[in-house]
From Swiss-Prot:
The lineage of its organism: Bacteria, Pseudomonadati, Pseudomonadota, Gammaproteobacteria, Enterobacterales. Its EC number is 2.3.1.117. Disulfide bonds: none annotated. Keywords: Acyltransferase, Amino-acid biosynthesis, Cytoplasm, Diaminopimelate biosynthesis, Lysine biosynthesis, Repeat, Transferase. It holds the Pfam family THDPS_N_2. Transmembrane segments: none annotated. It catalyses: (S)-2,3,4,5-tetrahydrodipicolinate + succinyl-CoA + H2O = (S)-2-succinylamino-6-oxoheptanedioate + CoA. The keyword Amino-acid biosynthesis applies. It is found in: Cytoplasm. GO terms for cellular component: cytoplasm. This is 2,3,4,5-tetrahydropyridine-2,6-dicarboxylate N-succinyltransferase. Belongs to the transferase hexapeptide repeat family. Substrate binds at R104, D141.
Length: 274
């Protein structure tokens, strides 16, 4: 694996000079191997090690290199034809392979090759970009998008129209992460490497970026780039120091543990926020 990483790191340093016409065989095969390993879930761009999320930057570099070394090509789909550098994940799947891998894909959901989809996942008409990791039991609902290299945990619900930001455009240092057992409400956006920690509930229409204030109304604490585990979050505003205006923020209205979440439905958690 170290040799593979070395090839990617070296090629990335000279990426500006690499084209589909001049890329060497070693680099092409290394990138192809990494994309295949990401696609199968054997490797992932970020993983939790000793309680901390670690981003493997060289894997992200391999994803970026894949766009340098591949030409656009015609891609046939059921509803249309496409013209892109990255092939579709399910292009060669037959019924036996879908049955073996154990997830559902509802048309016209689209997944790029290099994204991992775990068992018991349901993809409604949605989009999952290259390098993303979607873990077991997760629902990606209609018109939700999972950005490049985003990490989605087990038993997550991404509601209709949710946007989970990627790392490629604009280039971000770390992927956006939704940990296990989270609920992300309809039309919410989580971007710029924000981490939503385990068991959190994000209400409809909440926007979270690195500069978004995440205000805990019980403690008065303000978080940036991280929603603490077990938080129930809604949209809100905080007043300016002079009181002349207010700016958007996200508000943590309560904290819940796994036991409470198991007994109380998501809708009930969001309705009882006074």
């Amino acid at each position: 694996m170290q040799q593979l990483q070395n090839v990617i790191e070296t090629a990335f340093e000279r990426r500006a000079d690499i084209t589909p016409a001049n890329v060497d065989t070693v680099t092409r095969e290394a990138v192809k191997q990494v994309i295949s390993l990401l696609d199968s879930g054997a490797l992932r761009v970020a993983e939790k090690i000793d309680g901390q999320w670690v981003t493997h930057q060289w894997l992200k570099k391999a994803v970026l290199l894949s766009f340098r070394i591949n030409d656009n090509q015609v891609i046939d789909g059921a509803e249309s034809r496409y013209f892109d550098k990255a092939p579709m994940k399910f292009a060669d799947y037959d019924e036996a392979r879908f049955q073996k891998e154990g997830f559902r894909v509802v048309p016209p959901a689209a997944v790029r090759q290099g994204a991992f989809i775990a068992r018991n996942t349901v993809l409604m008409p949605s989009y999952v970009n290259i390098g993303a990791y979607v873990d077991e039991g997760t629902m990606v609902d209609t018109w939700a998008t999972v950005g490049s290299c985003a990490q989605i945990g087990k038993n997550v619900h991404l509601s209709g129209g949710v946007g989970i930001g990627g790392v490629l455009e604009p280039l971000q240092a770390n992927p956006t992460i939704i940990e296990d057992n989270c609920f992300i409400g309809a039309r919410s956006e989580v971007v710029e490497g924000v981490i939503v920690e385990e068991g959190s509930v994000i209400s409809m229409g909440v926007y979270l970026g690195q500069s978004t204030k995440i205000y805990d109304r019980e403690t008065g604490e303000v978080h940036y780039g991280r929603v603490p585990a077990g938080s129930v979050v809604v949209s809100g505003n905080l007043p300016s120091k002079d009181g002349k205006y207010s700016l958007y923020c996200a508000v943590i209205v309560k904290k819940v543990d796994a036991k409470t979440r198991g007994k109380v439905g998501i809708n009930e958690l969001l309705r009882t926020i006074d």
